[in-house]
Amino acid sequence: MSDSTPRRSRLGIYFEVPYRRDEGGFSTHVPFIRFVLALRPHFDGLVLVGRVDPEPGREPYAVPDSVEVAALPHYASLKDTIGIVGKFPATLRAIWGALGRVDAVWVIGPVPTSLPVAVLGLARKKRVVLGVRRDLPRYVRHHLGGRRWAPALGAAYVLEALFRLLARRVPTVAVGADLARLYSGGRASVLELAVSLVSEADVHALSKGSHNRDVGHPVELLSVGRLDPEKAPEMLLKALALLEKRTPGRYRLTIVGDGQLENQLRAEADRFGDAVRFRGHVPNGPELFKLYRASDIFVHVARTEGLPQVLSEAQAAGLPIVATDVGGVRAGLGSGAEALLVPPNDPEALAAAIARLASDGDLRADFRKLGIARARMLTLERQAARVAAFISGSEAWEPGDAAEHLHPG
């Protein structure tokens, strides 16, 4: 990375997130806002463009008063097609007005509402930078599934194709090596990003006292993520059942997160008694970090994935990791040698990997050392500085350039 300082300017950021407001100001439930807000020190001003729920309320992640929120008309979700279409003219007017108050705009998608922001930004002669966090067709296929949602899958392919076409002309920030390759090939540069929500202070606090820690009895397993189909949380219970058959009472699983499969999972977990604990959604911060520090092994079982932020959190805590080898997981961990990787949808392989880690102290120590070193390289501050430099145009990174910065030497 060069030492040049990003040109100071006002940055607008659009990503599909609902904001709420009360007497304390704006807030949201989406953890990624922590990364967005980390860009604030690099610009003269930050303007968040997004829909605002008319119902007052407070969410876990507050937006500071120093950051402006440009409110768009509210709709329930991206599934609310009628609401989106009905409010489209008002949405375009609000976007146009917000773009008049910024010098550049980072448009994160692809979602239906992100394309108008990018097009209007170009029309207003602003510097437009795209952001891509997931493979949209793959996400829709796993998240929705079934013939009923075939039209949505078709729309996802069209939307991604349009976003990729636009990315040939404007700079793009892509999360993970796979998306960086997918969006490269045009005239514009692509920044390969590993998103981290773990600050330098977090790494220090999480890693403190983690070295040479032995596993407890029971061995504490931790999983953090949405309880939705594409995250395959049922694999956790299937693997635990196999482990219980071989070594009864040796393992205890804590599941952090909520989602559409939560009730089903709770019912299935009844047979394990106290060996499975559900914590619901725990916001990124001290309470979640306490759970990381109290655990022995981190388990990630998604069947499709971008570059999961929870891996950075687990590595910062010095937790050895077992994860499915999908999407950007291997690249997110480093070279793939920093964890045990298993095929998706394979509870036998998952159980075997967990048992191996639980019984091999030297392997856990190696993973712990590599993980903490990587977390220190990929802090929130460092990654936000890279994105700020890229958006400002002071750096032109090509796919693959990030590799030397993303792998501990």
Describe each region flagged by the PLM:
Residues 320-323:
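Short hydrophobic beta-strand element within catalytic cores of glycosyltransferases
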Residues 70, 146-216:
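Donor nucleotide-sugar binding/catalytic pocket of nucleotide-sugar-dependent glycosyltransferases
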Residues 356, 363-377, 389:
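A short, well-ordered alpha-helix in the C-terminal region of glycosyltransferases
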Residues 99, 290-295:
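Short alpha-helical donor nucleotide-sugar binding micro-motif in glycosyltransferases
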Residues 335-336, 340-347, 356-361:
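Conserved acidic donor-binding segment of nucleotide-sugar-dependent glycosyltransferases
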Residues 210-231, 237-240:
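Conserved donor-binding/catalytic core segment of Leloir-type glycosyltransferases
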Residues 266-282:
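Nucleotide-activated donor-binding/catalytic signature segment of Leloir-type glycosyltransferases, i.e.
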Residues 303:
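Aromatic "clamp/platform" in nucleotide-sugar-dependent glycosyltransferases that forms part
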